[in-house]
Amino acid sequence: MNKEILAVVEAVSNEKALPREKIFEALESALATATKKKYEQEIDVRVEIDRKSGDFDTFRRWLIVEEVTMPTKEITLEAARFEDESLNVGDYVEDQIESVTFDRITTQTAKQVIVQKVREAERAMVVDQFRDQEGEIVTGVVKKVNRDNISLEIKSEGMAGNAEAVILREDMLPRENFRPGDRIRGVLYAVRPEARGAQLFVTRSKPEMLIELFRIEVPEIGEEVIEIKAAARDPGSRAKIAVKTNDKRIDPVGACVGMRGARVQAVSTELGGERIDIVLWDDNPAQFVINAMAPADVASIVVDEDKHTMDIAVEAGNLAQAIGRNGQNVRLASQLSGWELNVMTVDDLQAKHQAEAHAAIEIFTKYLDIDEEFATVLVEEGFSTLEELAYVPMKELLEIDGLDEPTVEALRERAKNALATLAQDQEASLGDNKPADDLLNLEGLDRDMAFKLAARGVCTLEDLADQGIDDLADIEGLTDEKAGELIMAARNICWFGDEA
């Protein structure tokens, strides 16, 4: 029998390219399982195989515990120390028992356990092999095409055969069709250690694919002379990528385009002809958005840092180009910059600002007990809300011509009183529908919008997580994109426990 064990270890180790120690451990586990099946009671068994001779010994063991709940597998510390005073809780007491003989049932049980353990070892090796390659481009051969995904064989160093990866349908480009035997490239974006199912996940549609292709085609990126700051994609159609240089002598956009467009064309070809805009990064968010809106010319831009939005004005003749087909250009620019962008004509922006200024003047005259001329001065100085007047540093108000400290103090006091009155009126009108603390504390949601949600019965994070974008579509000041972000943030906290 000992020779058979050594032969099995050698054969499986060679066939699966697994370490011999892993096979010995699998065999020991298999023999222990087979031994347990010989007993009517549930016992704990350990098998030890001699790595040189193949002989094995079998031991029944009891775990030392403070209080016994399973007499067939546990023993008290007091009883264990009758045999050995050095033992402690958590140690084992062992007695050697007769080893199993390999009849048909024992062999079948051992085989099942060995197969399972070998499979677990193989999956562990896949994780170890590819963990360091996560985020990099890999090349694979299409093994099987399914309706929802395709299976790839990826070359794996140090393993018998190839590892299997999966590209889900959403990770492929639109209209992209593959057949068994095709060689394709993609970014390995997930390596999962789960005991069942796919372990390696590859994508061709995520922005990381675009970034890694440029890293291959543009040596300056690998040398860290040029840095990729952000990327946004409408897979298979259009993309934008933001780059900056760490060497002022090098033009990052020109380097990424390449001689006669060779570098960007190579990336575009790999992505099915995807049009790629290379955008110059700027630390100034407004200037960066102007760059990202290319090829459209921006006439003016207004930044609202509190709401993290920008109003972009273009000439009427450029409006269609600025928005892009189905909103593609402005959507990609928004994703690239991380700002919510509102594109409109110069006339529309002027009309909007006039309406906002008129509304602010009305609020100031109504709640601050000042005349229209004074209210107009405040608006022209950049103040548009009661909150700004109530809490802005006093020195900013004192910079306005004609205002002294007593006037500023009185103005701030009136603004605070007005805010308190409005808050009380708002809460009274809501009745029981008031936003809970968890909703008020949600990042990206201001107090005003929280009360608007509460007025619709969305009072808690759970309520928000249960909403769809269409449910919130008619709330003033809430775009579909912003609604989607808030809903997903609530779901991440409520459903997935993400407190970040």
From Swiss-Prot:
Gene3D superfamilies: 3.30.300.20, 5' to 3' exonuclease, C-terminal subdomain, Nucleic acid-binding proteins, NusA, N-terminal domain. The keyword Cytoplasm applies. Keywords: Cytoplasm, Repeat, RNA-binding, Transcription, Transcription antitermination, Transcription regulation, Transcription termination. Signal peptide: none annotated. Its main location: cytoplasm. It comes from the Bacteria. Residues 369-494 are annotated as: 2 X 51 AA approximate repeats. Pfam families: HHH_5, KH_5, NusA_N. Residues 307-373 form the KH domain. Monomer. Binds directly to the core enzyme of the DNA-dependent RNA polymerase and to nascent RNA. This is Transcription termination/antitermination protein NusA.
